[in-house]
Every structure is written in C-alpha cells, then in structure tokens.
Amino acid sequence: ARCVASHALNIFGDHSDIYACRQTGFAMLCSSNVQEVMDLGTVAHLSTIEGRVPFIHFFDGFRTSHEIQKIETWDMEDVRDMVDFEKVEEFRKRALNPEHPVLRGTAQNPDIFFQAREACNPYYDAIPGIVEDYMNKVNEKIGTNYKLFNYYGAPDATHVIVAMGSVCDTIEETIDYLNEKEGTKLGLVKVRLYRPFRADKLVEAIPSTCEQISVLDRTKEPGSEGEPLYLDVVAALKGTQFHDVAIASGRYGLGSKDTTPAQIKAVYWNASWKDTYKPRFTIGIEDDVTNLSLETEGKLDSAPAGTTACKFWGLGADGTV
C-alpha cells in the first residue's frame, strides 16, 4: 500500500491507494508484518478461487514490503492440502477461451442496470465466511489465531484502538509496555478483512468493558467528517452495546511518516486529557496550523532489555528504497 500523489509526489507507504479502491468491488485483506504476508497471502488466493470475488491482499509499502525478516515459510504440500481443486477447475473454465466464447462488458440502460448491479450481493455476503474458513484451516496448519478482526491486549480494556497494517505491531508493543509498567487496561482491534466489512465480527472483537475507541487511519480525506475506517467503525457500532462509546478519529503515517510508541501512548492518553481531549487528531507531526496534533511526552522505549538497534542511512539506488 503506497501513497497517492496529492500536493506532492510521494512514493512511500500509506493507505490512500487502498481507500481509493473501495468502490472497485475487490475484497481487501490486510497483513501487518512479513509473517502475515506469507500466511494471509495463502488465505487470499484460496478465498478468491472459491468465492469468485477478486482480492487485494495489501501490506504497507516499504515498511513491510522491503523488510528483511526471519519467518516460518510454508511447505507447498500444506498449501496443496487446502486447495479445492474442483473450484480451481471451475475458475479455469471461466477464463476467456475462443472454444467456448462468452459476451462480457455489455452496455446496459436504466431499465436493467441497477438490478444487474445488485445481483452480485450473494457473492459478497459469502466472502467473510469463506475467508474465515480458510483462516481456520491456516490456524490448524501452523498454530496461528487469524480472525477477520483480531483482538490484542487486556481482556477488560477500557480504551481500544482500531487499526490495520504495520502500525499494529507498534501498538501491540506499546500495549504490552503500558499494561505491565503502568497498570493500564488497553487493547487493539486489528482489522484483517477490510472489505467486505463485517460489523458483527468487529463487535465480537471489542471487550464489553470498552469505554473509549480511537480509530487510526493512514490517509487523509479532505472535507470528510472522518476517514474511511473511522466511518466504517461508527456505522458498525450504531445500534450495538457500544453505541454510546466515545469514538475518536486519528490520522497517522502519511507518506511513511514514522509512528512511535510514544505517539501511540498519546492516543491512549488523549481520552484522559479532559480539558484538551481531541475527537479528531493527528500523530507524528506538530500541527501548528489547525492544532490537531497530539502532544507526546518524551521517548517511550518499549523494546525488550538487551535489544541492539541500528539505523541505516541511505536513499534510492543503494537498496534502502
């Protein structure tokens, strides 16, 4: 997932290209780190073959796509065990072939277009269940716990962040640190299947003790009441037991701006700053124009003791980009 040019060209990572694809009809599955790219890539391929809906399996540009990391790789025989070869054969038969031609891409007038457009609904209704089934098969194979929405943190959390992508690893690290060191009750809902968006599965993932939700979007939609994931969450929770929970909207990481544990702490602490609480905010920058940014209190070192960290400086042809 990479930045779409706006006031300037930027080739680095955010979710503006993904959100721009929302109306295409593609299902969207998100991975947060290199291991998940391996695991959920399998889920995406198998789900699209069975579900007959195209998939975008996305992960953050450069931050995840260019990361060198040790992972557990798949034995292709394990993948073969999960493949529905009857569905593969059906998939191949639907390919364009002069031996059995079909007509696609017709022009339709107002009398029929709307009805035909709605006819695809059963396929999209079925996709979450198909994805969930393949996630369960992957879980059985490799001992993971992939769900459409994964929860991480205190079982009785009072403040929960909803996010997707590589920032989730940073949030998890911050949760571990704050819950252990400061006795907080914080959590994270990690969005995996972004489209189709299953509201009931999101509700299942949120602890019943939740009093505050902060939704983090890695894009900016100028003029909107909120960014896409935030609006999805607000709509999903309406009419549920969380209908009166305060929901804040935050932007982060545009154009690969770094997001640190100290900034995530500021998101959690935002709700406790009664006099300066911001229902709409940014992190990672100092906004001296519209004053939406949250203040961070120094550096938060959440790395395990004994960690060696190195920073490599480079640009372009040396391989760092």
List PLM regions with ranges.
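Conformationally flexible catalytic loops at phosphate/diphosphate-handling active centers
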Residues: 55-150
